[in-house]
Amino acid sequence: MKRILIVDDEPVVIGVLRAFFAEFQHGHTYELTTASSANDAFILLLQEQFDLILLDIVLPVIDYWHVQQAAGLDLLKRVRDLGVTAPVLMMTGGDGGTPREVEALIEGAFGYLHKPFDLSELDHLVTLALGPRAASG
């Protein structure tokens, strides 16, 4: 069983990804965990291990007084600082090649996906990200 963490603040995106993993199993079983904020995801990553992380590039960060928009890049950096080695696929509403996407790759993201998703591209990147490990589970 492959454990996947989906981090996105849009319920529709989480729903699409849940449907995708139910449909495109390739004989594998996936356990999906979701988080709607960088804070929630960080806590999960401290407590659990995942085989793949799908991370929105822009997520809300809640401080004690208001909600700020903070790049998922910050979470990506914190994840790598924790020593988490799971591949991270960044998700973005951008049209490709933006500075944030380039920075995500520099910071160690495995790749990125554009919303709305091309399901064949999503399938291909998930298969590549899970690599040889996907064949065993």
Which residues fall in each region the model found?
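Two-component/phosphorelay signaling modules centered on CheY-like receiver
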Residues: 11-33
